[in-house]
Each structure stands twice: as C-alpha cells, then as structure tokens.
Amino acid sequence: MYKRQVIRSEGGFIWACKNYDGDVMSDMVATAFGSLSMMTSVLVSPDGNYEYEAAHGTVTRHYYRYLKGERTSTNPIATIFAWTGALRKRGELDDIRALCEFAGKLEQAVISTVESGIMTGDLYAMSSLENKKSVTSSEFISAIRNTLEANL
C-alpha cells in the first residue's frame, strides 16, 4: 500500500525507516522505476561515519561470463555514484572543493553519456530514446571517461 502511494506521489516528504525496512522499501520503489542498478545508499552512523554503496547486490553471473570472454553489459552507474557520493563527502569533510567539483563532473558525465544514447543493456531495454546504443560494461565506462575528460 505504501509503495503505491510513494510511487504515485510527487515527493516532498521524508520516509524514515529502520535499516532493514528502508532496504526493502527502497528496492521495491527502485524496481517500480525499472532498475536497481541506478540506486545508491548512504549509511550514516551515530558517531558520524559514512558508508556509500550501490544498493544492488553482486552480479556473479555477469562476472563469470566476463571471465569466459563473453560480452557483458553490467550497469556500473550505482557503483560510480556510490564513489562520487563518498568523494564529495570526503571533500566536504576536508574542505577540498576540487574533490567535490570532480565528483559532480563525474556524475554529470554519466548522465550525459546516457542522455546521448550510450547505455548498458538494462537501460537500453527501458529507454525511449530513438538513437540509442547498447554497449558492454567496458565500452560504457570508456564513453563516460571520454565525456568526463572533455569537461575537465
């Protein structure tokens, strides 16, 4: 019931949950929008420690296919955004503005790459873009790198 209300809402609220409940609810909401591979999670401890992570689990079957030399199209966006979140927080804590700016530019490079039509297979399957291309994990990361380097 709550999931339906959250999905249909326009936002503007805070949904406080205990750790396990938040994990389950966030996964269900993310799945309703298409892909867990786009969702990150931030855990904050009472003593001020932070952990940034991709909310999805491991992709063991993709890894085994990769080891066999087969084409894989694993979406790294949540992992990249977990790193950028951690980099930004480190920059804030240590007052390193350049690190915060780099994190933002890397995130924008990811978004721009997808908006340009270059994406992994999971996004390709849901995208309504006309000029889109499904690429391997390595090709996607290379495209992000090229976009980032052009904007540094």
Predicted regions and their residues:
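Short, small-residue-biased leader/transition segments that mark boundaries at the very start
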Residues: M1-Y2
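Internal helix-turn-beta structural module
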Residues: K68-T74, K89-L152
